[in-house]
Amino acid sequence: MFARIAITGAGIISAIGVGKNETLRSLIARKSGVGRLRHLQTAHSELPCGEVNMSDEELKNALGLPTGSIIPRTTLLGIIAVKEAMEQAGIKGTDRAALISGTTVGGMDLTECHYIQEGESSFFSLHDCGSCTDGIADFFGGFGLVTTISTACSSAANSIMLGADLIKSGRCDVVVAGGSECLTRYHLNGFNSLKILDSEPCRPFDATRNGLNLGEGAGFVVLESEEHALNRGVAPIGALDGYGNACDAFHQTASSDDGEGAFLAMSKALNMSGLKPGDIDYVNAHGTATPNNDASESRAMIRLFGDKIPPVSSTKAFTGHTTSAAGSIEAVICLLAIRHGFIPANLNWKEPFDGGVVPDAEGHQDVRLDHVLCNSFGFGGNDSSLLISRYGK
């Protein structure tokens, strides 16, 4: 029998706030962070995005880093979230602690600046995904193990899953796991070429949904065994009771029509936890607001829950789709929902579509949530689901 995985710290930064307190206020107030770009210079400035309302220099100042230092925005966002998580958990980097971060964009905000330059540039080799995680680790003086997960939009969820496995195997005592992603022209242009970006605020699970809004941010959680946390005298803020990953390999970018991968991921998470579908109090859906994803995810949820679907919402209309960081940002949102007793609203929803789930458009407060599912589905059908529980249940 594996030890229960306790969550003892959480940190977040996104378009709806820096830290858990700002994030909570925005969620309760139904205040979206999706809007016009302020910091990213792009030919597609008409596309609404969930941009963190701090420039690179403001982020550096907040962290006490030298002005003008060359640090990818992905790294800066990650440091902010990791710092909050580690401070809450009361830990520092040690030989028995690991840092796992998910990113796909990495340092492209810096690298893309040099593509138009003639001749060779050393910058091409300096800002890959792994170096961004190394930069986060360096800020805290290093960890015993540092690694990067890059599975597109399921990256951060997979980072958390790997962290739990490392603890269960005895390889690490503490793991700081999550993801960080910044907006870049490379990022925006790539998704625009797929024709899945909406020129209006996204509408998850709505009949008129027409694509996603990209976002940026970072989310991290501190994982350790329940025994290790209690021996340190730390009260867990939640528990990771189950998780599952499945890859249906249906298409390079599209979700499978029948939602097979999503169904398997959620089923695996439930099986690991020993819970039944009826025990789930809320589902934080992947809910990108693309016609394809929302239909596929709906089929998977209907298959799993039947006619007793728990409250469902996508928080991407708040933050934008933060791609590789989405799984951990939304995991922190789930922890906030459990702790403060509310269901986040599914913003901008008005009309159901045939075969689609009906989300909680208004949100609810003063509710008790004991077990929630948090879905993150990536390109190539790499689908992951986390089952997060109230500690003590």
Sequence positions of predicted segments:
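Phosphate/pyrophosphate-binding loops at sites that engage ATP/ADP/AMP, CoA/4′-phosphopantetheine
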Residues: 59, 83-97, 139, 228-235, ...
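Conserved small-residue
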Residues: 9, 27, 82, 99, ...
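Condensing-enzyme catalytic core mediating Claisen C-C bond formation in acyl metabolism
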Residues: 3-8, 28-38, 44-47, 197, ...
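Conserved catalytic cysteine-centered active-site region
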Residues: 1, 36-80, 96, 106-117, ...
